Amino acid sequence: MPYVTVKMLEGRTEEQKKALAEKVTAAVSETTGAPEENIVVFIEEMSKNHYAVGGKRLSDK
């Protein structure tokens, strides 16, 4: 049973997250042969306060 975790900044719509889960599931099924009903997708959203690049939080830009 494949498990996929997608980490991304918050702010996507529910429709975007639904489409992401559907397309990731389809891609994993196609490439691994796993049935779609056995594929688990976790979407973890992060606040810009909790994400930094080059030592700078995205919320500080």
UniProtKB/Swiss-Prot annotation:
Enzyme class: isomerase
EC number(s) from the headed UniProt entry: 5.3.2.-
Protein name as annotated: Probable tautomerase BC_5378
Keywords, in A-Z order: Isomerase
Active-site residues (renumbered): P2
Keyword Acyltransferase listed: no
Transmembrane segments: none
Residue ranges the record marks as coiled coil: none
Superkingdom classification of source: Bacteria
Gene Ontology terms for molecular function: isomerase activity
Family: Belongs to the 4-oxalocrotonate tautomerase family.
UniProt-listed InterPro entries: 4-OT (IPR018191), 4-OT-like_dom (IPR004370), Tautomerase/MIF_sf (IPR014347)
